[in-house]
A protein has these predicted regions:
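Motif-centric detector for short Cys/His coordination patterns
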Residues: 1-92
Length: 92
């Protein structure tokens, strides 16, 4: 019996956050590596959260202090981070 091995080259495009711009009122315009852009409104997520480690980002100065790290929006060394797919869909 001969076992056939099929070589299939899979090409997977990983989408990353390339840049982001704070617009105001807890909204950030996110620019993705595939050229797509999404305006993400974080305010409803922050306001409905009951957890103090999330609610602290209702301090606008703290919220605006994000960075792009490993292709994603990141607050305070992974203290607050969202799945890229959720950012892409604008559904937090």
């Amino acid at each position: 019996m001969k076992i056939a091995e099929e070589n299939i080259d899979y090409h997977v495009d990983f989408i990353e956050v390339k840049s982001a711009r704070y617009i105001g009122d807890y909204a950030i315009r996110v620019f993705f590596s595939d050229g797509f852009t999404r305006l993400v409104d974080f305010k409803p997520f922050l306001e409905t959260s009951l957890h103090p480690s999330i609610r602290k980002y209702l301090d606008e100065t703290r919220f605006k202090d994000y960075q792009i790290l490993d292709g994603n929006l990141n607050w305070n060394d992974y203290d607050l981070i969202f799945p890229i797919e959720d950012l892409y869909k604008g559904n937090l």
